[in-house]
Structure formats: C-alpha cells, structure tokens
C-alpha cells in the first residue's frame, strides 16, 4: 500500500501529508514501523556467515534520526512547535520545499542532538570493545556541502568515531571486505536496513524519538547469539 511504502522509506513528511495527520496518522505510522521491524528481526535471524565466530563487526550509526534530530532542525528553521504543523497545506510539496531551503546551507551542522545520543554510543562501544563508526547519507544534489556540515556536526557534538562514511549506498559497507564478517547498521529508515541485510549485513531499526535504547541492546545481543550459534 502507499502508506506502507512511505513508512518503509522513512518518508514521514509524505506519510502525514498524503495519508493522514494527527494521532490517527501517528498510530498507523507506528504500527507499520513495528511490523517492518519484525520483518527485519526475521531477516537477521536468517543471517549465516562461517567467518563470524572469530571476528568483530564494525558497528555503523546513522546520523539523522539516530544521533541528530533532523525534524527538530526543520522545526527550528520554520519556527514551529512541531514539524507536522507544516503538513496541513496539502497543495505544496513539503519535502521539496525543505530540501530546497537547506541545500547549500549549514543546516546539518545546526541540528539538535538527541538526549540519547551519548548513551547510544556508549552502548555500542561496550559491545565492540570501544569502537564505533558513522554511516550517513548525503543530501541528494548537495553531496559535498552536506557531507562537510554533517562532519562538522559530528566533531562538535559527539566523540570522534573510528570512521565517518557519507554515502548514498550504505549497503556497500554491509560486510567486511577482508574477512566477509557481517557489519551492523543502526538506522531509522527501514529501506536502508533492508538493503543492508540484502547485502549480507545485520541491521537494527532504531528511531531515537520513538525507540528506547533497549531495542539497540536487544539487537546487539541478537548478533552475539548468531555468533555463538556458528
């Protein structure tokens, strides 16, 4: 359905504008996200790699929606209490308008930091033994500029990661190129997780403004269980 497709792509702007708004819209969006999350868990359980047992994965954190509050930045830019207020006018393409406004600017460097960001990083470091990396998508049509300001946000808001990847094809990092070990992606968009899994990686669907850190902890524990079973 159209609702499922928009939710799968993480396109909340379009979901609330095209499908419905208010509490009913949020409830439907959350139901779809939960179902997609169950599918992702099932796909992770099917993961098999004979090289997993003696190797440590790279854990990649997405930036927007996971560490940085993209929609909080939109609210600040428009001067509204909640971004969903902007979806009331169905005559305009809100996504295009927002992209046009932030293209070529320092928008990504100004994003609010989620309160859970540092705890999330600590959770990942505890799992890996002290390492974490960033894998984030650039703004389409503004790759170099958006990458610059995303890296600035990272340097200003969190401890330095082991690696910062800015790419429109996250799934190319799904497996270690040397050992074949499945790497882990923590991302708020189901479509990114699905592509990651299709490329042989392990995905954890996590949206900072709706999920608790327990979801990440359980996901990491699930990876460890797969390792033990090999």
Where are the regions a protein language model picked out?
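Structural recognition of alpha->loop->beta junctions
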Residues: 150-166, 221-227
């Amino acid at each position: 359905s159209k609702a499922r497709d928009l939710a799968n792509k993480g396109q909340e702007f379009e979901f609330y504008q095209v499908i419905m708004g208010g509490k009913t819209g949020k409830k439907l969006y959350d139901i779809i996200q939960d179902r997609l999350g169950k599918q992702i868990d099932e796909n992770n359980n099917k993961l098999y790699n004979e090289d997993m047992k003696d190797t440590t994965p790279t854990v990649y954190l997405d930036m927007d929606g996971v560490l940085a509050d993209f929609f909080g930045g939109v609210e600040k830019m428009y001067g509204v209490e909640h971004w969903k207020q902007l979806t009331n006018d169905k005559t305009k393409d809100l996504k295009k308008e927002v992209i046009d406004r932030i293209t070529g600017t320092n928008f990504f460097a100004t994003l609010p930091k989620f309160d859970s960001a540092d705890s999330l990083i600590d959770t990942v470091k505890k799992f890996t033994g002290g390492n974490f990396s960033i894998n984030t998508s650039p703004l389409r049509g503004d790759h170099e500029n958006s990458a610059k300001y995303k890296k600035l946000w990272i340097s200003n808001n969190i401890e330095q990661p082991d690696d910062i990847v800015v790419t429109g094809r996250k799934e190319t990092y799904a497996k270690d190129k040397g050992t074949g070990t499945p790497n882990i992606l923590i991302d708020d968009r189901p479509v990114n997780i699905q592509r990651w899994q299709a490329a042989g990686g392990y995905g954890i669907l996590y949206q900072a403004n709706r999920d608790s850190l327990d979801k990440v902890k359980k996901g990491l524990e699930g990876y460890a269980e797969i390792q033990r079973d090999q």
